[in-house]
Protein backbone atom coordinates (compact mmCIF):
# COMPACT_ATOMS: atom_id res chain seq x y z
CA UNK A 1 0.00 0.00 0.00
CA UNK A 2 1.15 3.53 -0.66
CA UNK A 3 1.19 4.68 2.95
CA UNK A 4 3.99 2.34 3.93
CA UNK A 5 1.72 -0.37 5.31
CA UNK A 6 2.51 -4.01 4.57
CA UNK A 7 5.55 -6.16 5.07
CA UNK A 8 9.11 -5.99 3.87
CA UNK A 9 11.42 -3.02 3.38
CA UNK A 10 10.32 -0.49 0.81
CA UNK A 11 11.40 2.81 -0.61
CA UNK A 12 9.12 5.20 -2.48
CA UNK A 13 10.42 8.33 -4.19
CA UNK A 14 7.92 11.01 -5.17
CA UNK A 15 7.88 14.69 -6.04
CA UNK A 16 9.15 16.51 -2.97
CA UNK A 17 9.51 13.49 -0.71
CA UNK A 18 10.88 10.01 -0.16
CA UNK A 19 9.32 7.34 2.04
CA UNK A 20 11.25 4.48 3.61
CA UNK A 21 9.79 1.66 5.67
CA UNK A 22 12.02 -1.01 7.10
CA UNK A 23 14.12 -2.11 10.05
CA UNK A 24 16.61 0.21 11.69
CA UNK A 25 19.24 -1.91 13.39
CA UNK A 26 21.47 1.07 14.10
CA UNK A 27 22.30 4.43 12.62
CA UNK A 28 25.26 6.75 12.77
CA UNK A 29 25.07 10.37 13.82
CA UNK A 30 24.06 12.31 10.75
CA UNK A 31 22.26 15.37 9.39
CA UNK A 32 20.25 15.55 6.20
CA UNK A 33 19.12 18.30 3.86
CA UNK A 34 15.43 17.55 4.35
CA UNK A 35 12.80 17.44 7.05
CA UNK A 36 12.32 13.99 8.54
CA UNK A 37 9.09 12.61 9.96
CA UNK A 38 9.68 9.29 11.73
CA UNK A 39 7.42 6.88 13.58
CA UNK A 40 7.10 3.17 14.29
CA UNK A 41 4.05 1.46 12.78
CA UNK A 42 1.99 -0.96 14.77
CA UNK A 43 -0.91 -1.26 17.18
CA UNK A 44 -2.08 1.90 18.90
CA UNK A 45 -2.20 0.29 22.36
CA UNK A 46 0.47 0.69 23.48
CA UNK A 47 1.74 3.22 20.96
CA UNK A 48 5.28 2.29 19.87
CA UNK A 49 7.83 5.01 20.49
CA UNK A 50 10.78 6.22 18.44
CA UNK A 51 13.85 7.87 19.93
CA UNK A 52 16.49 10.19 18.52
CA UNK A 53 19.53 11.65 20.26
CA UNK A 54 20.61 15.10 19.09
CA UNK A 55 24.11 16.50 18.74
CA UNK A 56 24.10 17.68 22.36
CA UNK A 57 23.27 14.23 23.67
CA UNK A 58 19.62 15.06 24.46
CA UNK A 59 17.21 12.17 23.83
CA UNK A 60 13.87 12.91 22.18
CA UNK A 61 11.24 10.20 22.46
CA UNK A 62 7.69 10.12 21.20
CA UNK A 63 5.05 8.50 19.02
CA UNK A 64 6.47 10.52 16.11
CA UNK A 65 9.41 12.86 15.68
CA UNK A 66 10.06 15.71 13.27
CA UNK A 67 13.72 16.50 12.60
CA UNK A 68 14.50 19.81 10.90
CA UNK A 69 17.11 20.00 8.11
CA UNK A 70 20.78 19.96 9.11
CA UNK A 71 20.07 18.93 12.72
CA UNK A 72 22.71 16.45 13.87
CA UNK A 73 21.08 13.35 15.38
CA UNK A 74 21.06 9.58 15.63
CA UNK A 75 17.95 7.40 15.51
CA UNK A 76 17.91 4.57 18.04
CA UNK A 77 17.34 1.03 16.75
CA UNK A 78 13.75 0.00 16.14
CA UNK A 79 12.28 -3.17 14.65
CA UNK A 80 10.44 -1.22 11.97
CA UNK A 81 10.53 2.47 11.11
CA UNK A 82 8.46 4.59 8.78
CA UNK A 83 10.34 7.71 7.81
CA UNK A 84 9.53 10.47 5.34
CA UNK A 85 12.20 12.79 3.99
CA UNK A 86 10.47 16.01 2.91
CA UNK A 87 12.21 18.45 0.57
CA UNK A 88 12.48 21.79 2.43
CA UNK A 89 11.28 23.84 -0.55
CA UNK A 90 7.99 21.99 -1.10
CA UNK A 91 4.61 23.04 0.30
CA UNK A 92 4.35 20.09 2.72
CA UNK A 93 7.50 21.32 4.45
CA UNK A 94 5.59 24.45 5.46
CA UNK A 95 3.41 22.31 7.75
CA UNK A 96 6.53 21.02 9.49
CA UNK A 97 8.47 24.27 9.54
CA UNK A 98 6.07 26.38 11.59
CA UNK A 99 5.55 24.21 14.71
CA UNK A 100 8.80 22.30 14.58
CA UNK A 101 11.48 24.94 14.76
CA UNK A 102 15.15 24.26 14.07
CA UNK A 103 15.57 21.08 16.08
CA UNK A 104 13.88 17.78 16.95
CA UNK A 105 10.21 17.99 17.88
CA UNK A 106 7.98 15.35 19.43
CA UNK A 107 4.96 15.45 17.11
CA UNK A 108 2.46 12.64 17.82
CA UNK A 109 0.00 14.16 15.35
CA UNK A 110 2.18 12.91 12.49
CA UNK A 111 2.11 9.26 13.55
CA UNK A 112 0.42 7.25 10.82
CA UNK A 113 1.15 9.86 8.15
CA UNK A 114 0.05 8.48 4.81
CA UNK A 115 1.68 8.96 1.46
CA UNK A 116 -1.52 10.34 -0.05
CA UNK A 117 -1.42 13.11 2.55
CA UNK A 118 2.08 14.09 1.48
CA UNK A 119 1.88 13.68 -2.28
CA UNK A 120 -0.26 16.72 -3.30
CA UNK A 121 1.66 19.26 -1.21
CA UNK A 122 4.97 17.57 -1.95
CA UNK A 123 4.52 18.40 -5.61
CA UNK A 124 3.74 22.06 -4.89
CA UNK A 125 6.29 24.81 -4.16
CA UNK A 126 6.56 26.28 -0.69
CA UNK A 127 4.90 29.68 -0.31
CA UNK A 128 7.56 30.60 2.25
CA UNK A 129 10.60 30.09 0.06
CA UNK A 130 11.76 32.75 -2.38
CA UNK A 131 10.94 31.58 -5.93
CA UNK A 132 14.51 32.37 -7.00
CA UNK A 133 15.86 30.07 -4.31
CA UNK A 134 13.45 27.33 -5.36
CA UNK A 135 14.62 27.68 -8.95
CA UNK A 136 18.25 27.46 -7.87
CA UNK A 137 17.55 24.31 -5.86
CA UNK A 138 15.85 22.68 -8.83
CA UNK A 139 18.86 23.51 -10.99
CA UNK A 140 21.36 22.42 -8.33
CA UNK A 141 21.08 18.82 -9.48
CA UNK A 142 23.30 19.75 -12.42
CA UNK A 143 26.77 19.35 -10.92
CA UNK A 144 28.34 21.03 -13.94
CA UNK A 145 26.89 24.41 -12.94
CA UNK A 146 28.87 26.17 -10.17
CA UNK A 147 27.20 28.26 -7.48
CA UNK A 148 27.97 31.46 -9.37
CA UNK A 149 26.21 30.00 -12.41
CA UNK A 150 23.17 29.03 -10.35
CA UNK A 151 23.00 32.51 -8.89
CA UNK A 152 23.25 34.11 -12.32
CA UNK A 153 20.44 31.90 -13.62
CA UNK A 154 18.04 33.22 -10.98
CA UNK A 155 19.23 36.83 -10.98
CA UNK A 156 21.04 36.84 -7.63
CA UNK A 157 24.60 37.31 -6.50
CA UNK A 158 26.29 34.20 -5.08
CA UNK A 159 26.41 35.87 -1.67
CA UNK A 160 22.67 36.61 -1.70
CA UNK A 161 21.83 33.09 -2.86
CA UNK A 162 23.89 31.61 -0.02
CA UNK A 163 22.18 33.91 2.47
CA UNK A 164 18.70 33.02 1.22
CA UNK A 165 19.40 29.31 1.51
CA UNK A 166 20.60 29.74 5.08
CA UNK A 167 17.80 32.11 6.10
CA UNK A 168 14.87 30.27 4.56
CA UNK A 169 15.99 26.65 4.58
CA UNK A 170 18.66 26.47 7.25
CA UNK A 171 21.13 24.73 4.97
CA UNK A 172 23.82 25.58 2.43
CA UNK A 173 23.19 24.74 -1.21
CA UNK A 174 26.31 22.57 -1.21
CA UNK A 175 24.57 20.18 1.20
CA UNK A 176 21.48 20.15 -1.00
CA UNK A 177 23.66 19.16 -3.96
CA UNK A 178 25.02 16.19 -2.02
CA UNK A 179 21.46 15.21 -1.11
CA UNK A 180 20.49 15.23 -4.80
CA UNK A 181 23.55 13.13 -5.67
CA UNK A 182 22.45 10.56 -3.10
CA UNK A 183 19.01 10.48 -4.73
CA UNK A 184 20.59 9.86 -8.15
CA UNK A 185 22.75 7.08 -6.74
CA UNK A 186 19.71 5.51 -5.06
CA UNK A 187 17.88 5.58 -8.39
CA UNK A 188 20.82 3.77 -9.96
CA UNK A 189 20.83 1.11 -7.23
CA UNK A 190 17.10 0.63 -7.70
CA UNK A 191 17.67 0.14 -11.42
CA UNK A 192 20.14 -2.66 -10.72
CA UNK A 193 23.51 -0.91 -10.72
CA UNK A 194 26.20 -2.14 -8.35
CA UNK A 195 27.16 0.22 -5.50
CA UNK A 196 30.34 1.11 -7.39
CA UNK A 197 28.38 1.92 -10.55
CA UNK A 198 25.75 3.85 -8.60
CA UNK A 199 28.46 5.92 -6.95
CA UNK A 200 29.78 7.11 -10.30
CA UNK A 201 26.31 7.72 -11.72
CA UNK A 202 25.46 9.77 -8.64
CA UNK A 203 28.50 11.97 -9.10
CA UNK A 204 30.70 10.55 -6.33
CA UNK A 205 34.40 9.84 -6.74
CA UNK A 206 34.03 6.15 -5.89
CA UNK A 207 32.03 3.67 -3.84
CA UNK A 208 33.77 4.63 -0.59
CA UNK A 209 32.93 8.30 -1.16
CA UNK A 210 29.29 7.37 -1.80
CA UNK A 211 29.16 5.28 1.36
CA UNK A 212 30.67 8.04 3.51
CA UNK A 213 28.25 10.65 2.21
CA UNK A 214 25.22 8.41 2.66
CA UNK A 215 26.20 7.58 6.22
CA UNK A 216 26.92 11.25 6.92
CA UNK A 217 23.52 12.39 5.64
CA UNK A 218 21.21 9.47 6.49
CA UNK A 219 23.02 7.50 9.18
CA UNK A 220 22.83 4.41 6.95
CA UNK A 221 25.03 2.69 4.39
CA UNK A 222 24.14 1.59 0.85
CA UNK A 223 24.20 -2.04 2.01
CA UNK A 224 21.66 -1.26 4.74
CA UNK A 225 19.10 0.21 2.34
CA UNK A 226 19.74 -2.14 -0.58
CA UNK A 227 16.87 -4.53 0.35
CA UNK A 228 14.43 -1.62 0.01
CA UNK A 229 15.96 -0.44 -3.24
CA UNK A 230 16.18 -3.62 -5.26
CA UNK A 231 13.26 -4.11 -7.66
CA UNK A 232 13.36 -7.84 -6.95
CA UNK A 233 11.78 -7.08 -3.58
CA UNK A 234 8.73 -5.68 -5.34
CA UNK A 235 8.77 -2.79 -2.91
CA UNK A 236 10.94 -0.05 -4.37
CA UNK A 237 9.24 2.27 -6.82
CA UNK A 238 8.72 5.79 -7.95
CA UNK A 239 5.43 7.41 -7.06
CA UNK A 240 3.18 8.33 -9.95
What are these regions (language model features)?
Residues 1-160, 172, 190, 194-208, ...:
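Alpha-helical bundle regulatory/interaction domains
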Residues 164-189, 213, 217-230:
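Alpha-helical DNA-contacting segments of helix-turn-helix folds
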Amino acid sequence: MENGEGTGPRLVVGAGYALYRGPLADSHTHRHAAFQVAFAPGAADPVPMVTATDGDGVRHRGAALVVAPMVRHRMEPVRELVTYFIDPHCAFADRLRAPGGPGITVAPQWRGLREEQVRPAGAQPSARVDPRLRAAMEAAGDDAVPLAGLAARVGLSPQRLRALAQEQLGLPLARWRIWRRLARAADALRAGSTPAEAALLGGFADQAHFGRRMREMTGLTPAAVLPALRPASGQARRAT
